[in-house]
C-alpha cells in the first residue's frame, strides 16, 4: 500500500539575492580596482571593505591576440562586462582605485586605464571617488639597466 500524500508539506522556495537588499533609487557603492600595466589591464570590483570580490575581468579574457591585452579596446570590453555584472547584483555606484605597476618600475598607468574608467562612467554607473594607489617607494631598490642605463 502506498503512503498517503495528504500529510506532505509543500516547501516554498525563497529567492536568494547575492546583492544587498535596497530600495529603488538608493545608491549602493562598490570599489573598482583598475590595474593598468603595459602588458594587461585588470578591472576588479569588490565590496567597500575590499574583501569580497564581485567581479574580475582582464583585457586578456576579452581579446585573442596577446599583443592586444593591454589595449584600450580590451580594457573597455572588460569594464563593460564588470559594469553589467555589478548592475545585476544591485551595485549602482563605484569608487575607483587606479594603479600602475609602480615600485621600481614605471609609475604611469598603461594605455587601458583611461578607457576602462571611461567605460565604467558611460555604463550608467555613478562614480564616487577616483584615487591613484600606485605603490611609490620612499627609497627604492636599484632599478634594472645598469650604471649606463638601457641603450637603444
Curated annotation (Swiss-Prot):
<dbReference type="InterPro" id="IPR001971">
    <property type="entry name" value="Ribosomal_uS11"/>
</dbReference>
<dbReference type="GO" id="GO:0022627">
    <property type="term" value="C:cytosolic small ribosomal subunit"/>
</dbReference>
<dbReference type="GO" id="GO:0000028">
    <property type="term" value="P:ribosomal small subunit assembly"/>
</dbReference>
<keyword id="KW-0687">Ribonucleoprotein</keyword>
<feature type="region of interest" description="Disordered">
    <location>
        <begin position="131"/>
        <end position="152"/>
    </location>
</feature>
<keyword id="KW-0689">Ribosomal protein</keyword>
<feature type="compositionally biased region" description="Basic residues">
    <location>
        <begin position="143"/>
        <end position="152"/>
    </location>
</feature>
<comment type="similarity">
    <text>Belongs to the universal ribosomal protein uS11 family.</text>
</comment>
<dbReference type="GO" id="GO:0006412">
    <property type="term" value="P:translation"/>
</dbReference>
<dbReference type="GO" id="GO:0003735">
    <property type="term" value="F:structural constituent of ribosome"/>
</dbReference>
<protein>
    <recommendedName>
        <fullName>Small ribosomal subunit protein uS11A</fullName>
    </recommendedName>
</protein>
<dbReference type="Pfam" id="PF00411">
    <property type="entry name" value="Ribosomal_S11"/>
</dbReference>
<dbReference type="InterPro" id="IPR018102">
    <property type="entry name" value="Ribosomal_uS11_CS"/>
</dbReference>
<dbReference type="InterPro" id="IPR036967">
    <property type="entry name" value="Ribosomal_uS11_sf"/>
</dbReference>
Amino acid at each position: 500500500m502506498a503512503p498517503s500524500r495528504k500529510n506532505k508539506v509543500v516547501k516554498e522556495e525563497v529567492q536568494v539575492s547575492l546583492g544587498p537588499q535596497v530600495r529603488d533609487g538608493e545608491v549602493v557603492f562598490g570599489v573598482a580596482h583598475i590595474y593598468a600595466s603595459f602588458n594587461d589591464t585588470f578591472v576588479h570590483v569588490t565590496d567597500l571593505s575590499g574583501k569580497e570580490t564581485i567581479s574580475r575581468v582582464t583585457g586578456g579574457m576579452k581579446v585573442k591576440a596577446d599583443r592586444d591585452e593591454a589595449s584600450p579596446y580590451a580594457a573597455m570590453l572588460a569594464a563593460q562586462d564588470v559594469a553589467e555584472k555589478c548592475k545585476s547584483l544591485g551595485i549602482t555606484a563605484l569608487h575607483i582605485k587606479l594603479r600602475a605597476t609602480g615600485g621600481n618600475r614605471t609609475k604611469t598607468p598603461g594605455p587601458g586605464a583611461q578607457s576602462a574608467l571611461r567605460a565604467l562612467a558611460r555604463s550608467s554607473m555613478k562614480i564616487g571617488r577616483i584615487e591613484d594607489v600606485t605603490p611609490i617607494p620612499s627609497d627604492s631598490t636599484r632599478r634594472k639597466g645598469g650604471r649606463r642605463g638601457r641603450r637603444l
